[in-house]
Design a protein with these regions (language model features):
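A six-helix transmembrane bundle that forms the core substrate pathway of small-molecule transporters
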Residues: 1-329
Length: 329
């Protein structure tokens, strides 16, 4: 069951990343349909990624109050619904606004997957599951332009959104109907509530039940905490900056490749999409290394009596990060 849940949340993460990039394959079609410049069409990507940055600050804290599953189900439903106006949009404004809403809503799965895996797996077991999750946000943007190129050439840009609807709807069904709640405090609170109803004994309580703070105060604490971690914990700040650089490079390719290969060399969108295959292959190769990396981590666990330093997880990144500037050359 743990691997089933892991596979479903990783697939959802892939779908979200795929949705962010698939439309890059036919931005020219959007510009032609609505009579706007390509820079304006690019806003459909920009606002989606901005939503990625806004959503986590609310959804991650809320999941600690409501549980993971309600946040997954509600945000994915909103995201799926707002793909439809994108597919049938009659003006660029509708497209941009709905993409922003989708970006905010789709941020929830991207944010909660790490917490879900932490709920499911012990610290020493998380290496391979986390590798599956970490690979998904990078494979999705690599596969998106590839699939989108052929779809856009054959069916037009609107089908890029119908494709998102199909994939996201499938993920919504899987997450909503097959993935149970994983957040331990929420599970315990529900179990205690059930026991109180069955026995009439009020002694069955959890830590959440004993927290008598008003909901507003709890929300304030949970909503402020991400900003405190970001700006007051150097490791969180620097990892966030590092990941921002990686994602900025990735999304820069979405804009640069069409300029280089379509405008510069006269290639079609489908042929240009093939240039993203090496990126996907690289991510898959990296994920395949995770069992070996996890083996080293297990040795560190044994060496430190089950309590290895958190920085032990950073060793593979310290070596692999140098491949990025080399690859850009």
């Amino acid at each position: 069951m743990k691997w089933w849940c892991t596979a479903n949340v990783a697939l959802t993460c892939f779908a979200v990343a795929f949705n962010s990039a698939v439309i890059t394959a036919d931005l020219a079609g959007v510009s032609e349909t609505f009579g706007v410049s390509e820079e304006v069409s690019l806003l459909t990507i920009t606002v989606f990624v901005i939503g990625f940055g806004v959503g986590p600050m609310a959804f991650a804290p809320l999941s600690e109050i409501c549980g993971r599953r309600p946040i997954y189900a509600s945000t994915l439903l909103v995201a799926v619904v707002f793909i439809i106006p994108c597919a049938v949009a009659q003006n660029i404004g509708t497209l941009i606004v709905c993409r922003l809403i989708d970006g905010i809503a789709f941020a929830a799965p991207m944010t909660l997957v790490g917490g879900t895996l932490a709920d499911l797996w012990r610290n020493e077991e998380r290496g391979v599951p986390m590798a599956c999750f970490s690979a998904a946000p990078f494979i999705g943007p690599a596969i998106g332009p590839l699939v989108g190129g052929f779809t856009g050439d054959a069916l037009g840009w609107r089908w890029l959104y119908w494709l998102q609807l199909i994939l996201s709807g499938f993920c919504y069904v899987l997450i909503t109907f097959t993935v149970p709640e994983t957040y331990a405090p929420t599970i315990l609170a529900r179990r205690a509530s059930k026991l109180r109803k069955q026995t009439g004994d009020s002694k069955y309580v959890t830590e959440m039940d004993l927290d008598k703070r008003p909901l507003g105060e709890r929300l304030r604490v949970f909503l402020v905490r991400p900003f405190q971690l970001l700006f007051m914990e150097p490791i969180v700040l620097f990892i966030s900056i590092y990941m921002s650089v990686l994602y900025s490079l990735l999304y820069m390719f979405f804009v640069a490749y069409p300029v280089v290969y379509q405008e510069g060399k006269g290639w079609t969108a489908s042929s240009t999409g093939l240039m993203f295959i090496p990126l996907a292959v690289g991510v898959i190769m990296s994920a395949m290394c995770s069992p070996f990396v996890n083996r080293h981590y297990l040795q560190m666990v044994a060496k430190h009596d089950g309590k290895p330093p958190a920085e032990a997880r950073l060793v593979p990144m310290m070596w692999s990060c140098w491949f990025i500037p080399v690859g850009l050359l």
